[in-house]
């Protein structure tokens, strides 16, 4: 089965925690176990940042699902979640905040968003995790790659 692409919705604080760990581990909320079981090595995860409403990074899953409750992500105040369903990962494209891709600029281009009325496009990113189709995956990856600074070796 070909690799799938998922959009992981999270706060700027959770993205910062993932970045601090080198995008080497991705965690899903307690109630996302069923979805976690669908994710496989080789799948891609694209990070959508709440409040800012932008795409910030992508990573590839490099290992199987495991459970770990060691705190990494801050989660919501008063409602802690250990994000216990975890995967080893490696970063593909990681943007600095000024280069994050505003989702608003892709409202008419992403098939996933078209499931909702245009004026309610933000509903497309409610909940922590969703799988997207190949066309959306290509578009987002192209935009992330084009926005990633190239560094000299």
Residue ranges and their predicted role:
Residues 1-12, 21, 27-34, 69-153:
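Contiguous surface segments at macromolecular interaction interfaces
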Residues 12, 52, 66:
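Short, glycine/serine-rich, charged loops/turns that create anion-binding
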Residues 48-54:
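Short, charged beta-turn/beta-strand-edge "cap" motif at the junction between a beta-strand
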Residues 55-64:
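Short beta-strand-centered aromatic/proline hotspots
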